Amino acid sequence: MASFRKLTLSEKVPPNHPSRKKVNFLDMSLDDIIIYKELEGTNAEEEKNKRQNHSKKESPSRQQSKAHRHRHRRGYSRCRSNSEEGNHDKKPSQKPSGFKSGQHPLNGQPLIEQEKCSDNYEAQAEKNQGQSEGNQHQSEGNPDKSEESQGQPEENHHSERSRNHLERSLSQSDRSQGQLKRHHPQYERSHGQYKRSHGQSERSHGHSERSHGHSERSHGHSERSHGHSKRSRSQGDLVDTQSDLIATQRDLIATQKDLIATQRDLIATQRDLIVTQRDLVATERDLINQSGRSHGQSERHQRYSTGKNTITT
């Protein structure tokens, strides 16, 4: 038995045997199967040590395939141990049925169960091999995915910068439109002030003309008074006196018109003062709003520069 334990798997199976690549448990006794499993366990421990040395370089998919293989081996061992426990429950004097001729008497495992376990083992081994190959291909495809996932944050960062630039452009256009709306009333107020100034100049020119007419009328009135005194001394015609009265009456009417025009000028000047006061209030309000917007814009620019420096670092 000790010499048989030292044999390798190639020595136990003949070279010309048709199932050299796959071990057939139907031609082996229970002791041979146990020895084969011990050798297989030794080889598995050596492979496990090699895998532990290279575990840092292996992908999670290959480790998963190894875990499937290890579970399958434990399942096969349970299958064999359950079969042995079932056979030990039988009486020693009874000859088991379904045994192969020439089979070792210590091998208490029935032929049907041996075939079933062998088929399950081979099928599971092929399945695990296919899974390991698929996991290997999947691990080979993972670098491309990792490169794509690595390039994705850069694209997201670029899209975020573009979105921030678009938002700033929209806010700038809104501010420009608001400034245009605010400047339009200022332009209208300036145009109204120009019209009022032009009206004031016209009224001043009319007032100067009325003053000149008033001086002329005063001069004519003085001349008429001087002629009236001469006529009084010389007892002149009544016709000249009547003409002087008519001229004086005309002067009074012209003076009354001048007073009415002057009153209108005062009313217009008062209206101009009221409108000018309103313009001053609106201009002051615009200046306050503009200073507030400038302060907010400076704060937004400061926050943007701080965020940009944070992203750069």
From Swiss-Prot:
Protein name: Leucine zipper protein 4
Subcellular location: Nucleus; Cytoplasm
Positions with biased composition (Polar residues): 126-141, 169-179, 304-313
Region (Interaction with DDX39B/UAP56) location: 1-119
Main location: nucleus
Positions of short motif UAP56-binding motif (UBM): 22-40
Region (Disordered): 1-238, 290-313
GO CC annotations on file: cytoplasm; nucleus
